[in-house]
UniProtKB/Swiss-Prot annotation:
Species of the source: Pseudomonas aeruginosa (strain ATCC 15692 / DSM 22644 / CIP 104116 / JCM 14847 / LMG 12228 / 1C / PRS 101 / PAO1)
InterPro entries: AAA+_ATPase, ABC_transporter-like_ATP-bd, ABC_transporter-like_CS, ACT-like_dom_sf, MetN_ABC, MetN_ABC_transporter-like, NIL_domain, P-loop_NTPase
Function statement: Part of the ABC transporter complex MetNIQ involved in methionine import. Responsible for energy coupling to the transport system.
SUPFAM superfamilies: ACT-like, P-loop containing nucleoside triphosphate hydrolases
Pfam entry (one): ABC_tran
Descriptive protein name: Methionine import ATP-binding protein MetN 1
Residues where ATP binds: G62, R63, S64, G65, A66, G67, K68, S69
Length: 369
């Protein structure tokens, strides 16, 4: 596999001030005691403390009204916090105004759910617009736009108009336009919510590619756990303006602690099938096997081994249902096993099952069909 290179036209228009010796070990973005209150007393954010590492893809998820949009919009000062601090490269941006605020927003690109393209301008003209407004020389604009069209895969659509593009192509234009000033941070506000599943996967793959090739820090908000699973390194869960859970994606998916997280994960986790649920009893009938839930949270890096499970339990074992997926190199999921063990032997069966899974739970007994 050949190494990918960044087109020369994607080099910065002008260098950003950096201090590698002091910034290398600090978070790229840090929020301390952040709060946001709107007129009428609506408290959108409460006591948010958060660190986002340089170069990571960081996800913010929550239900509608949880405070996701308010949070992401404080990062480029589209919203001014009511309390607390937003620090970029360890510098508080709360006092920025005028030219300092303009410079900040050029360092922080943003894409939205709705593409906000100018219908009377071509793809090339839409991408070039921020550079024209900034007074960048024409030749430099053409070079820069050509590199961005190559990056997002729209070279052949350079002279097309938005009405001639698919939703995924429109979002690619939005991404290219957000990158014109060579930002260090890219904010994504529900960037795939208006797309079909195929276009969603393509846009997420493009964002991950951009993250790796350009070293951008990407912060995205979504209400879809599948998006978090696909692209993010770490995630926070918001509810009523507060962080209720956070961690590496595999940690949050493998062992969700908060009810909101479990609810958001509901459609992605292997649920108990209805026919099996109908046969489940808490008190065993004569000869009814026990139903065990073997859970794999990723904490031990254990990989489910069906033969090892059968040998460890040492009883008649039937796999009735389950699902395992890999997230960040770890196996996560659950296996539902029907085990033909007499009640007196159940403690020993559970002890053995605990040797081959991260968590074991007795769900009940399966009545004979």
């Amino acid at each position: 596999m050949t190494a990918m290179t960044v087109p020369p036209s994607l080099l910065p228009l002008e260098p950003f001030p950096t201090a590698p010796d002091t910034r290398a070990s600090t978070p790229h973005i840090r929020l301390h005691g952040l709060g946001k209150r709107y007129p009428g007393g609506v408290q959108a954010l409460r006591e948010i403390d958060l660190e986002i590492r340089r170069g990571e893809v960081f996800g913010i998820i929550g239900r509608s009204g949880a405070g996701k949009s308010s949070l992401i919009r404080t990062l480029n000062r589209l919203e001014r916090p009511s309390e607390g601090q937003v620090l970029i490269d360890d510098e508080d941006i709360g006092g920025y105004d005028g030219q300092r605020l303009v410079a900040l927003r050029r360092r922080i690109g943003m894409i939205f759910q709705h593409f906000n393209l100018m219908s009377a301008k071509t793809v090339r003209q839409n991408i070039a617009l921020p550079l024209r407004v900034a007074g960048v020389p024409r030749a430099r604009i053409e070079e820069r736009v050509a590199g961005l069209l190559q990056l997002v895969g729209l070279e052949e659509k350079r002279d097309a108009y938005p009405a001639q593009l698919s939703g995924g192509q429109k979002q690619r234009v939005g991404i290219a336009r957000a990158l014109v000033h060579q930002p260090q941070i890219l904010l994504c506000d529900e960037a795939t919510s208006a797309l079909d599943p195929e276009s969603t996967q393509a846009i997420l793959a493009l964002l991950r590619d951009i993250n790796r090739r350009l070293g951008l820090t990407i912060v995205l908000i979504t209400h879809e756990m599948a998006v978090i699973r696909e692209i993010c390194d770490r995630v926070v869960v918001l509810e009523c303006g507060r962080i209720v859970e956070q961690g590496e994606v595999w940690e949050v998916f493998g062992d969700p602690r908060h009810a909101v997280t479990r609810s958001l994960l509901g459609s992605l986790r292997a649920a108990l099938p209805a026919d099996l649920q109908a046969r489940l009893r808490q008190a065993p009938g004569a000869g009814d096997p026990v139903l065990l839930d073997l859970q794999y949270t990723g904490a031990s890096r254990r990989v489910p081994d069906l033969l090892a499970i059968a040998r460890a339990i040492g009883q008649r074992v039937d796999l009735l249902h389950g699902g395992i997926e890999r997230i960040q190199g770890r196996a996560l999921g659950r296996l539902l096993l029907q085990v033909g063990a007499p009640p007196g032997e159940l403690p020993g069966v559970l002890a053995k099952a605990a040797l081959v899974a991260d968590k074991v739970e007795v769900l009940g007994h399966v009545a004979h069909a």
